[in-house]
């Protein structure tokens, strides 16, 4: 049975409602796009699957307005990781080390891993997706697609089938996105191969349940090696614990990738591994056995109309807890770039950066996955190294101990804050051949391609202490943070900056809102353009800032004018902590552009004259659909 011959048209069809699909669906739905979202499961995830939210992902969830709802489930929070190994006398296991899962050298407000099962996370997303006007249709699957170009605006034809009724629906879309998981129909139809980086594969038994035990670290993340085997312990919400038990490895003489084990067999293995401690199960909520091989898709897209993300592109072991987190980052990267193109800001060619950025991160993830396994199974750190690594500051010594360096790099990467996109059209580092000498602020502590550093400031509109990196929600807009330094020193530079923003072909004027005449007085983030939000931060005490001397175009962002007057323990001697932590001279200031995903795009010196806005025009003009930088006056 098929539907009528006039196919409905969508901006995007999303297949799969796992982590990558739901975050992409939420962003696209909230940002005004028509989304067709299907999943082949009759109901959302009830138990099991991914459960670890890393610190940077928590930051993203807060930026999406979801963190509070997820925390309402009272999830377990892992601040510490313990390592257990065999006792020398063979009498069982002993703790050989423990350290923070997110050490102090990582600047985050969330120095912990949040653990709650995927079904609850999905529920939060699905509720918000529905509020934004999209419903995930179940149980539907994809049975065919082609980019036939018969409709220039909606070039992708997609065939979908309801698994309950066998109804087949044909739709047209601008884009098709596969978030189907490791067994992706879309990837298979495109003929894209998974390249296995590591020939070693594993079979794991995974069990969620409520246990009784005298093992002292049951509420802590643990990696346990014993003469009877290896286990990973992950605390969960509602008094549950997740146990990962390695059942088989391809290094075993009789390795069978289809090897299985019953829940009772895995429990018996766990009991042997944990000796001299006992463990008993009150109940088992979920149990599964699955093979793990490290693989990465050779391509994420062939035509920049049909894309893939999440497990459809990369698979790895559960040790580092990265699957869902990497999927979230894939989705956000995809979402803001599609929005940049479809909103008319960016040329279509920028979509190629989705694959180059995210595939590079997946490659790095698999490399770290290998290091993680080697680090904890082949070499035991001594107590001195553990303490040194956990307290070390970044960049301390060029001759760091290999273990300390690997530990730091691993923690930073797995936290999400080690993700660094390489230089490209969006990420301008000092190697970029930009003509303006104002790019790159001397002494800046921000790294292009990495997430914006947290800082706390006072919002002048209501005197609230706020987290600057969270002040602009994930709305698809670029963020321009103007660190204005001392007001008396920067007054002319700010006046010139504002005057040049007013020009007709400034980035702000060229993409001003079509409804700017009707815009609400209460519009917080986008009074001029839906594609940019400006923030102004002065190195002054709150009551010393003269609002009347701030140009009107910047005063329009009245909810985004701040005083840098809150101390920061990371720069205890700083008078103006946000400026100084980020590396700005409090007298001179500077400008930071972050992408809609909060990664650093570029930094620019704040100078008198047109130079600062000229530099920003050059940056945005490198990918914009309109010429930027002409000299006519604007009506903003």
From Swiss-Prot:
GO biological process, one term: biosynthetic process
GO MF annotation terms: FAD binding; oxidoreductase activity; oxidoreductase activity, acting on paired donors, with incorporation or reduction of molecular oxygen, NAD(P)H as one donor, and incorporation of one atom of oxygen
Top-rank EC class of the record's enzyme: oxidoreductase
Catalytic function, reaction form: 4-hydroxybenzoate + NADH + O2 + H(+) = 3,4-dihydroxybenzoate + NAD(+) + H2O; 4-hydroxybenzoate + NADPH + O2 + H(+) = 3,4-dihydroxybenzoate + NADP(+) + H2O
Chief localization: membrane
InterPro entries registered for this protein in UniProt: FAD-bd, FAD/NAD-bd_sf, Phe_hydrox_C_dim_dom, PHOX_C_sf, RIFMO-like, Thioredoxin-like_sf
Protein name: p-hydroxybenzoate-m-hydroxylase
EC number per UniProt: 1.14.13.33
Gene Ontology CC: membrane
Keywords for the protein's UniProt record, in alphabetical order: FAD, Flavoprotein, Glycoprotein, Membrane, Monooxygenase, Oxidoreductase, Transmembrane, Transmembrane helix
């Amino acid at each position: 049975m098929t539907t009528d011959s006039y196919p409905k048209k969508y901006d995007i069809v999303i297949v799969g409602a796992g982590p990558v699909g739901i975050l992409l669906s939420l962003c696209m739905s909230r940002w005004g796009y028509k989304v067709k979202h299907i999943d082949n499961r009759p109901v959302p995830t009830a138990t099991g699957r991914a459960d670890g939210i890393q610190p940077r992902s928590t930051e993203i969830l807060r930026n999406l307005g979801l963190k509070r709802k997820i925390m309402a489930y009272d999830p377990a929070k892992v601040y510490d990781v313990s390592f257990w190994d065999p006792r020398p006398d063979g009498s069982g296991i002993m703790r050989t080390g423990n350290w923070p899962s997110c050490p102090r050298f990582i600047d985050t407000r969330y120095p912990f891993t949040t653990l709650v099962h995927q079904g609850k996370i999905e529920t939060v997303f699905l509720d918000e997706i529905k509020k934004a006007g999209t419903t995930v249709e179940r149980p539907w699957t994809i049975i065919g697609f082609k980019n036939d170009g018969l409709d220039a605006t909606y070039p992708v034809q997609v065939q979908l089938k309801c698994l309950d009724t066998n109804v087949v629906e044909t739709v047209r879309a601008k884009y098709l996105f596969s978030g189907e998981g490791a067994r992706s129909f879309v990837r298979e139809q495109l003929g894209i191969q998974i390249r296995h980086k590591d020939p070693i594969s594993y079979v794991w038994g995974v069990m969620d349940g409520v246990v009784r035990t005298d093992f002292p670290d049951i509420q802590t993340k643990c990696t346990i090696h014993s003469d009877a085997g290896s286990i990973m312990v992950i605390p969960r919400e509602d008094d549950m614990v997740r146990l990962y038990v390695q059942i088989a490895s391809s290094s075993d003489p009789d390795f069978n990738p289809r090897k299985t084990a019953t829940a009772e067999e895995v429990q018996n293995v766990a009991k042997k591994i944990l000796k001299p401690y006992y463990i008993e199960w009150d109940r088992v909520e979920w149990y599964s056995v699955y093979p793990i091989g490290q693989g990465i898709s050779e391509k994420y897209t062939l035509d920049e109309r049909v894309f893939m993300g999440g497990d459809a592109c990369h698979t790895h072991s559960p040790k580092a807890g990265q699957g869902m987190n990497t999927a979230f980052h894939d989705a956000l990267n995809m979402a803001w770039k599609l929005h940049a193109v479809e909103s008319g800001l960016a040329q279509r060619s920028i979509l190629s950066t989705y694959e180059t950025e995210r595939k590079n991160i997946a490659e790095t993830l698999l490399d770290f996955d290998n290091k993680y396994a080697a680090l904890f199974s082949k070499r035991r750190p001594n107590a001195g190294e553990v303490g040194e690594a956990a307290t070390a500051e970044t960049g301390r010594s060029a001759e760091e101990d290999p273990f300390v360096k690997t530990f730091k790099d691993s923690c930073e990467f797995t936290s999400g804050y080690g993700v660094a996109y390489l230089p490209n059209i969006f990420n301008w580092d000092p190697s970029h051949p930009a003509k303006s000498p104002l790019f790159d602020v001397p002494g800046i502590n921000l790294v292009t391609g990495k997430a914006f550093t947290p800082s706390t400031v006072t919002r002048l509109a209501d005197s609230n202490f706020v987290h600057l990196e969270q002040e602009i929600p994930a709305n698809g807009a670029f963020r321009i943070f103007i660190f204005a330094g001392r007001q008396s020193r920067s007054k002319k530079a700010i006046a010139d900056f504002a005057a040049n923003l007013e020009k007709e072909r400034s980035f702000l004027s060229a993409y001003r809102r079509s409804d700017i005449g009707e815009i609400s007085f209460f519009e917080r983030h986008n009074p001029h353009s839906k594609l940019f939000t400006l923030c102004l931060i002065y190195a002054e005490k709150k009551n010393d800032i003269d609002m009347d001397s701030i140009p009107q175009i910047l005063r329009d962002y009245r909810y985004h004018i701040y005083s840098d007057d809150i101390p920061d323990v990371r720069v205890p001697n700083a008078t103006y902590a946000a400026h100084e932590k980020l590396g700005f001279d409090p007298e001179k200031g500077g400008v930071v552009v972050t992408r809609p995903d909060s990664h650093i795009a570029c930094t620019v010196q704040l100078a008198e004259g047109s130079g600062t806005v000229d530099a920003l025009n050059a940056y945005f003009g490198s990918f914009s659909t309109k010429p930027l930088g002409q000299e006519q006056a604007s009506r903003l």
